[in-house]
Design a protein with these regions (language model features):
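Short, solvent-exposed amphipathic alpha-helical segments in soluble enzyme
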Residues: 2-4, 48-55, 78-82, 110-116, ...
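Active-site histidine-anchored catalytic micro-motif
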Residues: 26-36, 41-98
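Glycine-rich, charged/polar anion/phosphate-binding loops
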Residues: 20, 71-77, 107-110, 168
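The feature marks the mature, well-folded catalytic cores of soluble enzymes
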Residues: 1-27
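Internal helical hairpin/lid segments
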Residues: 133-198
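Short gly/pro/ser/thr-enriched loop/turn and capping motifs at secondary-structure boundaries
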Residues: 20, 40-43, 69-73, 102-104, ...
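A conserved active-site cap/scaffold subdomain adjacent to cofactor or substrate pockets
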Residues: 84-159
């Protein structure tokens, strides 16, 4: 994008998809493309922006979608660890689950770690004491030989997550067959694309 801007393209940093929608409304003669990136936390606002653009007939607004999925990346890492050959080392003892991502997904989304890979997950909040407590909880699980999904961030994360946000994402997006991750390579079913209806 910096190169495009240097070549004369009108590239603007916006705080949110709402800002991009406002740019499209204010400039009906110009095509406004929102670069939708990020994990589960940033995906629902993009979905709502797409729905708003469709509802309001905003034909000069589009999204370049690069929303990715945390569980798929975790599975890819765990699969690499499981397939490590002699002389290769990639040991994963457990995960500290990301807080805001988990608010959307819910703690149940990590069950595969315990069931399929026998790895514990502790969802941590943002505050220093949250992080320390989550690390302690994870170390206790490891010391006790447990592989549970625990939620340190109970003040914000529920088992089911944010159902309204999940519904908006399910309506607007669909799984891509594969996505190329920087540093990880292609990971199957690890990103979202915009459904044909949008």
């Amino acid at each position: 994008l910096l190169h495009a801007r240097a070549d004369g393209a009108d590239v603007r940093m916006v705080y949110s998809v709402s800002d991009a929608l406002e740019l499209a409304r204010a400039n009906p003669e110009r095509q406004v493309v929102f670069f939708g990136i990020g994990f589960e936390t940033t995906t629902p606002p993009t979905a709502l922006g797409i729905l708003e653009a469709q509802r309001s007939g905003l034909d000069n607004f589009s999204v370049f979608c690069n929303h990715v999925l945390t569980p798929a990346a975790m599975k890819a890492i765990l699969n690499v660890a499981a397939d490590a050959g002699e002389g290769e080392t990639l040991e994963v003892d457990g995960f500290s689950g990301p807080s805001h991502v988990s608010v959307i997904m819910g703690s149940d989304a990590y069950r595969f770690c315990a069931r399929q890979y026998h790895k514990p997950v502790v969802i941590a909040g943002f505050e220093p004491l949250d992080v320390l407590q989550a690390i302690l909880m994870l170390v206790r699980q490891l010391n006790q030989g447990r592989t549970d999904i625990e939620n340190q961030y109970t003040r914000a994360v529920t088992p089911e997550g944010n159902r309204k946000a999940q519904a908006a994402v399910a309506e607007v997006f669909e799984l891509r067959p594969s996505f190329e991750w920087r540093g990880l390579g292609a990971i199957p079913r690890s990103a979202l694309g915009i459904a044909d209806a949008y």
